[in-house]
């Protein structure tokens, strides 16, 4: 389970503000956010890297492309499915949507959000679970309190993405998985176990895109039981 919240052209200083928590088994090898080149891709990607699958869960480019994904829980995971993480990496390709349509049965179920940072249209969704609603309310409150000033991405992450409050069991959705496991996953920040394997929030990220094209990528990631901070800034390259 991952969770995201964003605001598009709703702040006087930012075109986009995005929050994202990635939840994964702690044993899965992962690199923190950095610039890296994926095989066969033209642009470098800024984002973390899943060393097992080779992809990412949240990535952006200097050319203004941004993509992230969240998983959809399935009672029986697909055997031999390709990694979802390759999708944000491939999102900028020509004819990519046709390739995805042809390969959709080979990839585990997920929700993929794509942004072209110089466009004016934003994605939307209608089915919101309790922790998403909770994060949305907290995010709106944070923005209302900082509507005339530059936003601290670190403060935004620490105040909003570390919330461990779980949903009331009466509103936990029925997704077909074990209800007790569903309950464990009902907070914004997750820290639990599945059998003997520790599972939970591995990284918390915030991206701020200012109106002048300055992009800041803030990440707080967990490695060897320690939380590490990482900040990358760059100027978005405008299309000629």
Where does each model-flagged region fall?
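N-terminal nucleophile
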Residues: 1-240
């Amino acid at each position: 389970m991952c969770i995201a919240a964003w605001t598009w052209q709703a702040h006087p200083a930012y075109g986009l503000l995005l929050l994202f928590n990635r939840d994964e088994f702690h044993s899965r090898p992962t690199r923190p956010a950095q610039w890296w080149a994926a095989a066969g891709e033209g642009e470098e990607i800024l984002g973390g890297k899943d060393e097992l699958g080779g992809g990412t869960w949240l990535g952006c480019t200097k050319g203004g492309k941004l993509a992230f994904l969240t998983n959809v829980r399935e009672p029986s995971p697909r055997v031999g499915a390709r990694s979802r993480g390759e999708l944000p990496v491939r999102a900028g390709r020509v004819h990519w949507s046709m390739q995805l349509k042809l390969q959709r049965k080979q990839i585990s179920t997920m929700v993929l959000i794509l942004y072209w940072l110089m466009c004016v249209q934003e994605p939307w969704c209608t089915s919101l679970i309790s922790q998403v609603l909770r994060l949305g309310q907290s995010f709106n409150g944070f923005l209302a309190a900082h509507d005339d000033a530059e936003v601290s991405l670190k403060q935004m992450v620490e105040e909003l993405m570390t919330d461990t409050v779980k949903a009331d069991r009466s509103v936990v959705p029925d997704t077909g998985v074990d209800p007790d496991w569903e309950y464990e996953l009902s907070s914004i920040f997750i820290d639990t176990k599945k059998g003997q394997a520790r599972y939970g929030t591995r990284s918390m990220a915030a991206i701020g895109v200012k109106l002048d094209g300055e992009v800041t990528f803030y990440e707080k990631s967990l490695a060897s039981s320690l939380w590490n901070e990482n900040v990358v800034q760059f100027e978005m390259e405008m299309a000629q």
